[in-house]
């Protein structure tokens, strides 16, 4: 299907032409007032009126185009997504300087049209200002209280592992697609933390929420939604936007129903999860006369939606990449399983075992680096006028920290384009942290759930490798396994099947 067919359901030539002409006039008028008198802007390819650099961008994998442009224009450059000016930051040193050393300058979120459709400015991921600060602070505090990065989360993951293993065992070594089972296992961890309980993998409410969250993240990265972000007036003709909005509406109704059930059984002295804690805080503020606080229903619903979506797709996708890479490179799988057998034996792996499994830890980190699942991060904006590396960037300018250029920076990684666990090992085989490992981004917008994600990846990965030998389906060789990502907002493995043969 062509991009135009993907975007347009119907068209009114007169309406579209009139709108294009109107926007062209606005563009020409606005382009006359540049910031040249304030300072030199980052270089970049010359944009066309209205279209910007669209003809130079591959909207199906824009991160690849941006990496190529960085070779020509340097580590900071300007590109126009349609009429919208965007500054791209490339390479470890530049991204770190912006996100870490000048965190306040580059710390705001760019609320694109589709992100606004998601949250209307509420919640944790796609918000700015005092509301975002309060919601993020509250989320961090309470997620720690309910186990993020601590013993509580470990117990929840250890409870979930047997359910996932049971699903794998039911296939009896025959080829199957790991997508849904891994998605549901990971989704249950955040469900237990947010709602206070896990769901059965056959629960239609749960599977619907998990499947819709994954589909929505995939659609967000589609070429048609990127076109919508550039030209919001195209919205009525974009199929994927219609599907996204339906998913968002369904998600909101499902969260409202789950919250209603929790509210009916709420015990302020025994909070079961994030939702309970939020409801108690909201009730306390209202009883003290604070009726205009940030603790309102919209912030609750969208914060829960953010935590559920962000806490499932990225971790589940990374785990699936790990299993695929183990199947693709059996000699590396051999070394992981030898280390697990030698150090752990047949007992359950625990988080405290990580320090004694340096090779396995290196493999997990290298999986995250090479999988590069959020290549363009989530866009930022400048919170004020900024002078950065000699260039002037106006307040409110969209900024893309190109994470793929950090995770594959050839000045930081010895073999950036190959799967090489030695990137995280010293000469004695000990684990080595690498500063350029920014799989969770950095600065004010660093991933809220980094600690939880690291724990999930370690415990799920080691438990599965301890229990199963992963191999290609009959008739398929390791060389046949395709590592080309399925394009979307996150980079998923292409559709594939694996065989999980019991080692027990």
From Swiss-Prot:
The protein's location, in the record's own words, is: Endoplasmic reticulum membrane; Microsome membrane
Record's GO cellular component terms:
endoplasmic reticulum membrane
Q: Which UniProt keywords apply?
A: Endoplasmic reticulum, Heme, Iron, Membrane, Metal-binding, Microsome, Monooxygenase, Oxidoreductase
This entry's comment on induction and repression of expression is: Constitutively expressed.
Instruction: Name the PROSITE patterns for this protein.
Output: CYTOCHROME_P450
Family, similarity comment = Belongs to the cytochrome P450 family.
Residues noted as binding heme in the record, renumbered to the chain: 447
| Cofactor(s), names only, from the UniProt record | heme
Q: What is its main location?
A: endoplasmic reticulum
Q: What are the GO BP annotations of this UniProt entry?
A: aflatoxin metabolic process; lauric acid metabolic process; lipid hydroxylation; xenobiotic metabolic process
EC number(s) for this protein? 1.14.14.1
Kindly provide the name given to this protein in its UniProt entry: Cytochrome P450 2K1
Q: What is the lineage of its organism?
A: Eukaryota, Metazoa, Chordata, Craniata, Vertebrata
The UniProt entry, under Pfam families, shows: p450 (PF00067)
Q: Name one GO molecular function term.
A: heme binding
Taxonomy, superkingdom: Eukaryota
UniProt effect for mutating residue 79 to F = In allele CYP2K1v2
List the gene name.
cyp2k1
Q: How does the record say this protein sits in the membrane? A: Peripheral membrane protein
Q: Which reaction does it catalyse?
A: an organic molecule + reduced [NADPH--hemoprotein reductase] + O2 = an alcohol + oxidized [NADPH--hemoprotein reductase] + H2O + H(+)
